[in-house]
Amino acid sequence: MTTMFDAAVIGAGPAGSAIATLLARAGWSVALVEQQAFPRRKVCGECVAASNFALLDALGVGPEFAERAGAELRRVALMRGDETIVAPLPAAAGAHPFGRALGREYLDTLLVAAAEAAGATRWQPWSLQAISGSAGRFVLRVRRDETAEEAELGAALVVAAHGSWQPLPSERDERRDARTVGDLFAFKANFRGATLAGDLLPVLSFPGGYGGMVVADDGVLTLAGCLRADRLRALRAAHPGLRAGDAFEALLRNECRGVADALDVATREGAWLASGPLRPGVRVDAGDGVFRIGNAAGEAHPIVGEGISMALQSAFVLAALIAPARAELTAPASAASVQRSAQREHTRLWRRRFARRLAVAAAFAHVAMRPAPAAAAWPLVRRWPGILTAGARWSDKTRCAPEAARLVAAFA
């Protein structure tokens, strides 16, 4: 038996839960499919820029976020070798102009609960096995792994919001075939008792990678970073008895004095998490009839910490486009042509609002992890620390996509 929905959303991270909430509120029947049980830790820098606070309010989770998140992030630092350079972070408009950090085990749980409260049907933990059909008549086969139970969902429209690490079934072979020595693998760990100032957001620069630190909820420090596959392979060979995450931590302590100082008396909570390889780049128009948001649409190098921002804002941009047109987008007679037109417009909007963030992040990432450009840039940043402030502004940390802002205003 097939359970029918207007829309199926794949992935219940910030992008997926946000679009599910917005569509459900607009009268759509929505299936929200997520393969992992919540709460769960996730590889992520966990920063939420202030430009997204109004979006969290509109989704109904703003007060809970404000109560739990870490301190306002007012300063940015660049750490390389033994040196640290500090500059102010730019302020966004509004009553709360600076970003804050909240662990994904809390943020994602808040957002998926909001989607369910709005009327979305939560399929969790169910994993997507296959998608067939086309606009107006998609069929999704899902499986509950712990019981081996399977179900079939019908949906007129599909939104992919599965992030970086879990490609759609149709993408898996291509991902495996595309691996190179330049691939980036991501790591994250949490620490208690760290001495990093709560208002400071350090960016880490070292050969073959980059990273960051932030103090999130309950004073817990998040340390996250990326490392090229060839550097990771050499690191593992040099430390054959260590797990990859432990070897990565040793590298950071050795190559960034700021990390060693911050973690000097800290204790790690839980194991290191690892994911990858990352796939920075644009995938918003894959040509398969599926709408894409969040990292499924396009992934920025995480050096600028814009992943959650792009996830939330891209969900609002898509919702503003499709939510009012449920009848035309879901009717079998019109779905194919209307969805094609909507996808063209969505691709145009997405590139206009987010492509620059990807380009800026790529430029910063390649400077940070390549020794020669990093060495050349360092004297300039040391002399003019305001470059760091400008860099945060260039990556759109203080701006919200206009379509998202207008939708928030409509809810208000």
For the regions a protein language model found, what residue spans apply to each?
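Conserved N-terminal glycine-rich FAD pyrophosphate-binding loop of Rossmann-like flavoproteins
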Residues: 37-57
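A conserved beta-strand/loop capping segment in the N-terminal third of enzymes
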Residues: 53, 57-109
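Conserved Rossmann-like nucleotide-cofactor binding loop
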Residues: 15, 38, 165
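Beta1/beta-strand and adjacent pyrophosphate-binding region of the FAD-binding site
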Residues: 2-15
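Predominantly flavin-linked oxidoreductase catalytic cores and closely associated redox partners
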Residues: 114-261
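Glycine-rich FAD pyrophosphate-binding loop
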Residues: 24-44
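C-terminal helical "tail/cap" subdomain of flavin- and related membrane-associated enzymes
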Residues: 320-412
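FAD/FMN-dependent oxidoreductases across multiple families
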Residues: 233, 238-322, 326
